[in-house]
């Protein structure tokens, strides 16, 4: 590998997108931000190529699961995010790796989801 590694490159899914809106401010960047943070395909890869990034280490956007108070909903969203990330990693081998999103409301549930991410997806 000769390119750069982008560490902790955030992505979002529709379920976590709204949580990031406060960080975008009122400067009119929300539409571009939305398009870019949801994308794990062509546009993101094009940006990576232009920046000399060979591999991106993906992680769910902040505050992500921590902003979801209901433990069952947090697990549901974690699974959706992890599945989306795994799909992108499989679609673009060598371009993406990822850090699992884990619902820390219950350590046993988090451990089960981590095991699923490591061994099943």
Q: PLM ranges: what are they?
A:
Residues 1-121:
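Helix-coil boundary/capping segments in enzymes
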């Amino acid at each position: 590998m000769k390119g750069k590694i982008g560490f902790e490159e955030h992505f979002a899914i529709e379920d976590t997108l709204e949580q990031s809106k406060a960080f975008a401010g009122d400067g009119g960047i929300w539409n571009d931000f939305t398009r870019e943070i949801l994308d794990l395909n062509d546009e993101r890869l094009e940006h990576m190529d232009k920046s000399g990034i060979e591999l991106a280490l993906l992680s769910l956007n902040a505050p992500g699961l921590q902003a979801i108070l209901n433990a069952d909903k947090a697990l549901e969203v974690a699974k959706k995010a992890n599945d989306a990330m795994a799909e992108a990693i499989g679609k673009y081998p060598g371009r993406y790796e990822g850090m699992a999103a884990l619902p820390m409301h219950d350590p046993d549930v988090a451990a089960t989801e981590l095991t699923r991410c490591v061994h099943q997806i």
